[in-house]
A protein has these predicted regions:
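Membrane-interface helix-loop-helix junctions at transmembrane boundaries of multi-pass membrane enzymes
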Residues: 218-230, 304, 308, 318-353
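Structural signal for the C-terminal ends of transmembrane alpha-helices
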Residues: 30-32, 168-174, 211-221, 320-329
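Residue-level signature of transmembrane alpha-helical entry/exit and packing/kink sites
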Residues: 11-19, 106, 131, 155, ...
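Membrane-embedded helix bundles of polyisoprenyl
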Residues: 22-25, 111-124, 128-217, 231-251
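Transmembrane-lumen/periplasm boundary regions of multi-pass, lipid-linked membrane glycan transferases
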Residues: 55-56, 237-266
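Membrane-interface coil-to-helix junctions
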Residues: 25-117, 136-160, 267-313, 345-358
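Transmembrane helix-loop junctions in multipass membrane proteins, especially transporters and channels
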Residues: 34-38, 175, 196, 215-223, ...
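Start-transfer (signal-anchor) and selected internal transmembrane alpha helices
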Residues: 1-31, 227-232, 236
């Protein structure tokens, strides 16, 4: 079983080669942003950029982290409102000293996402080429490119941690070592610091389901199971603690935000499900232009969208073939079940339409 033999140590060279190859792929795809004097002009990129530039200058001049910015909505907090969090994301200590700016940081996170997919697949002893292609499929998913292009960098960078979190969870449950729990805690903490709560929530949902599958399918003694569950729970708590500087202030401010002030203590259901995917629009996974390519050409069920949710025919065919071939393995069953759960969540307000069609 692939779940039974995850190697504790792997050679560094294959991972270095994979990382270099992913970097070359990213540079080939986004060369205009890296090598040419071009930038992205999406409103979601330009609007926050203006205040970020001013806050960066204020931080540099004062030597203190700005906690208030007066330019938006007659003034609003920076940390509590998630409007200026770059300084609380620990990896930015390194990225801020590199000469390629925010776009370069996002591209490096794309490479990190691909390497995470590679590491996850190699942990199941897949061939290097197969693992590399799997990581590339995740890294080059059109959704990731759309997040980069349309100014949702935090969403992209938070999603980059998803395969790494699953990889770390597997290691904790198979090796039950403190070092693995520490690595998972760091991954979880950094992902939460990147502060796209929705993507982090999806990641934790998948991680929890995987942990449950690993506990049930392993047939270990109660003592061994409790040991692994303890390491896992500790990693989760430490991960939350790492990101506390972001979420403690935000939790105090939430009641005053637009979403938190809605009835019931959170965003109204109608508002929260405005961008639900109608079951019929799943066809765009195969034919991206079926409901238009976004913008003024879009005529689907969402209020508007800037891009189709294309997954790729080849990727989907390979995923289906892999599921059929290895459907008896716990991790494959986890992937199949989590895919169905993800679709049900995506349907949102249209779940009744899905139920009626069934």
């Amino acid at each position: 079983s692939p779940l039974g033999g995850i190697p504790a140590k792997n050679g560094v060279l294959p991972y270095a080669a994979a990382a270099a190859a992913y970097l070359l792929l990213a540079l080939a795809l986004y060369y205009q942003l890296v090598f040419l004097p071009m930038t992205l002009s999406a409103p979601d990129s330009l609007v926050p950029l203006a205040s970020s530039i001013a806050l960066d200058r204020l931080r540099e001049a004062s030597g203190q982290y700005p906690l208030w910015q007066p330019w938006t909505f007659a003034g609003m907090p920076t940390v509590e409102a998630f409007s200026y969090l770059g300084g609380l994301y620990y990896p930015n200590i390194v990225f801020s000293r590199l000469p390629f700016g925010d776009i370069g940081s996002q591209i490096l996170h794309l490479c990190f996402a691909g390497l995470g997919g590679y590491a996850l697949l190699r942990s199941f002893r897949l061939h290097h080429a197969a693992a590399f292609l799997g990581g590339a499929a995740f890294m080059l998913n059109p959704y990731m490119t759309a997040m980069l292009v349309h100014g949702h960098g935090s969403q992209l960078m938070t999603a980059a941690y998803m395969p790494w979190v699953l990889w770390g969870t597997l290691r904790v449950f198979h090796h039950a070592k403190l070092a693995d729990a520490g690595m998972l805690a760091i991954l979880l903490g950094f992902q939460l610091q990147r502060a796209h709560v929705q993507i982090a929530w999806y990641t934790w949902l998948l991680m929890g389901l995987l942990a449950l599958v690993l506990l049930v399918s392993a047939h270990r003694t109660v003592k061994e199971s409790l040991k692994r569950a303890g390491f896992f729970a500790t990693a989760c708590m430490v991960g939350i603690a790492i990101s506390a500087a972001v979420y403690l202030p935000a939790s105090e401010y939430a009641a005053y935000s637009v979403r938190g002030a809605a009835g019931g203590g959170g965003a109204a259901m109608e508002y929260a499900t405005m961008w639900s995917m109608h079951p019929v629009e799943l066809l765009t996974f195969l034919v991206p232009g079926l409901y238009g390519f976004g913008g003024v050409t879009y005529w689907g069920f969402m209020p508007f969208t800037d891009f189709p949710h294309y997954a790729g025919i080849v990727v989907l065919l390979l995923a289906f073939a892999g599921f059929v071939a290895r459907r008896s393995e716990p991790f494959v069953l986890f992937l199949g079940g989590s895919t169905l759960l993800a679709l049900l969540i995506a349907f949102g307000a249209f779940q009744s339409a899905w139920a009626d069609s069934v």
